[in-house]
């Protein structure tokens, strides 16, 4: 498992975060984000020191992995997973619900039922497994964006006057698919390594271009992050605001400005 210093270094990757109209060059140093990033880093260090709770042996490979990546096949496995979720929740007194174990569970569930993705062709099931193994082996922090902007939801995505308010496929190429549009409420993405993108709202039969399921690195070219105002910017001090100043996941609007997603990252 990686430690806190490795995690913080991974965030200094040129990601395009904008706050108050200006680009944030380093979320680990900016006062709006630094405290929350440090809390996650501290928990990564604590996870290393608590390996009996936070890790386990992978039944398939025999290698030690983070328990949040364990595909459960028994009641004992479920107990291990419960323990690691409790570990991460205790680190923020329950205030952070989108810590690294959260979307790790989504990807682990995908890998545990890969045949669902094979319905679109075996390639997609293979893609799920490959990315799951990458995220597991590198102990990645993955966030997700699944909620479209608050526009008229009585109108199908494909029938809006501006067709790419919702994120959708602009075109397909040999290299992958090109995504344009925006999602809202991408919680914790400013502190994550990768972003899983899909839809939580129902899609109409004609919305095929919006039926997406994919992953992108947070520093992908064309991906812009527009967070709401972090609570730390309103706190006079960490002493006076010990919780909100340190445990803010920062909901974020993510804008896809023709982001190329390689086929291997499409599920």
Task: List the predicted regions and their residue ranges.
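Glycine- and acidic
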Residues: 19, 112-117, 237-239
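FAD-binding core of flavoproteins
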Residues: 149-267
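A short, Trp-centered hydrophobic/proline-enriched beta-strand micro-motif
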Residues: 139-152
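Generic structural signal for well-ordered, non-transmembrane alpha-helical segments
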Residues: 34, 38, 133-136, 178
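General beta-strand structural signal in soluble alpha/beta enzymes
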Residues: 19, 143-146, 178-180
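Glycine-rich loop at the start of a catalytic domain that most often binds anionic cofactors/ligands
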Residues: 30-34, 60-71, 157-160
């Amino acid at each position: 498992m990686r430690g806190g210093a490795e995690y913080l270094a991974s965030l200094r990757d040129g990601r395009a975060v904008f706050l108050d109209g200006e680009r944030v060059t380093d979320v680990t140093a900016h006062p709006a984000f630094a405290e929350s990033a440090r809390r996650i880093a501290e928990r990564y260090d604590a996870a290393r020191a608590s390996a009996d709770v936070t890790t386990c042996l992978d039944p398939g490979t025999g290698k030690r992995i983070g328990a949040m990546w364990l595909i459960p096949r028994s009641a004992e496995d479920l107990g291990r997973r419960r323990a690691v979720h409790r570990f991460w929740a205790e680190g923020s007194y329950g205030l952070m619900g989108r810590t690294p174990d959260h979307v790790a569970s989504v990807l682990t569930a995908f890998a545990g039922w890969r045949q669902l993705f094979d319905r679109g062709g075996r390639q997609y099931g293979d893609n799920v497994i490959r990315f799951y193994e990458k995220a597991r082996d590198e102990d990645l922090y993955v966030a997700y964006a699944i909620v479209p902007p608050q526009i008229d939801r009585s109108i199908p995505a494909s029938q809006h006057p501006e067709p790419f308010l919702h994120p959708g496929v602009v075109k397909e190429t040999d290299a992958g698919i090109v995504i344009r549009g925006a999602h809202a409420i991408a919680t914790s993405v400013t502190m994550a390594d990768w972003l899983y993108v899909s839809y939580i709202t129902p899609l109409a039969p004609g919305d095929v271009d919006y039926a997406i399921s994919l992953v992108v690195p947070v520093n992908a070219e064309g991906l812009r992050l527009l967070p709401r105002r972090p609570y730390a910017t309103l706190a006079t001090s960490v002493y006076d605001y010990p919780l909100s100043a340190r445990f803010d996941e920062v909901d974020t609007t993510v804008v896809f400005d023709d982001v190329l997603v390689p086929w291997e990252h499409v599920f």
